[in-house]
Amino acid sequence: TRRSSDLIFRKQLQTAAEECLIMRKDTYQDCLVLYPESAWNEQMNELRERLNRWDPTHQTVFRQFVSDVEIITLDANGRFLIPKRYLKMAHIEQDVRFIGMDNTIEIWAKEMADKPFMAPETFEKELQEIMGTPIER
């Protein structure tokens, strides 16, 4: 299924001169995550720094993290192809919703993304707790 990235995301990618995107299934949610190549490289560098190459569990976690990655290129119209196996992983059957998440873009099945991700009172409580915590610098 070929999808067109939202105009705002397309402009950001063009401004950043990103050649390709990296797609993987989110670790915790049933959505897909698109990383600009530079953001993916940053995350990979951070993960590598934390890994103990001599720890078999670390190796397995690393292998799992990178094993199901797809390199995505945008065509001249800003469209890209989502492989069928990714559509299945994210339960995407038809319409999608793009959600900007800092330096990545999540792709959700529209019917899943249109529902609240958490109850409003839980969201308020969690946001208050996060924003009330001093930033460590």
Predicted regions and their residues:
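Short, small-residue-biased leader/transition segments that mark boundaries at the very start
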Residues: 1-4
